[in-house]
């Protein structure tokens, strides 16, 4: 599996949160595609 994106935490900037959520969505897509 690809590495799971790091959660930037409570004090992250909006840009960091957006980047994290985008990376997380991409990660989930990769993992679910491999499983099914």
From Swiss-Prot:
Superkingdom in the source lineage: Eukaryota
Pfam families to which the protein is assigned, alphabetical: Hormone_3
Keywords for this protein: Amidation, Hormone, Secreted
InterPro entries for the chain: Pancreatic_hormone-like (IPR001955), Pancreatic_hormone-like_CS (IPR020392)
Principal localisation: secreted
PROSITE patterns per record: PANCREATIC_HORMONE_1, PANCREATIC_HORMONE_2
Residue pairs linked by disulfide bridges in the UniProt entry: none
Subcellular compartments: Secreted
Modified residues (Tyrosine amide): 36
Gene Ontology MF, one: neuropeptide Y receptor binding
One GO biological process term: feeding behavior
Entry's Gene Ontology cellular component terms: extracellular space
Similarity comment text for this entry: Belongs to the NPY family.
Record PANTHER family: NEUROPEPTIDE Y/PANCREATIC HORMONE/PEPTIDE YY, PEPTIDE YY-RELATED
Stated name of the protein: Peptide YY-like
């Amino acid at each position: 599996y690809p590495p799971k994106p790091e959660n930037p935490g409570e004090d992250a900037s909006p840009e960091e949160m957006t980047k994290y959520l985008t990376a997380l969505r991409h990660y989930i897509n990769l993992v679910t595609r491999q499983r099914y």
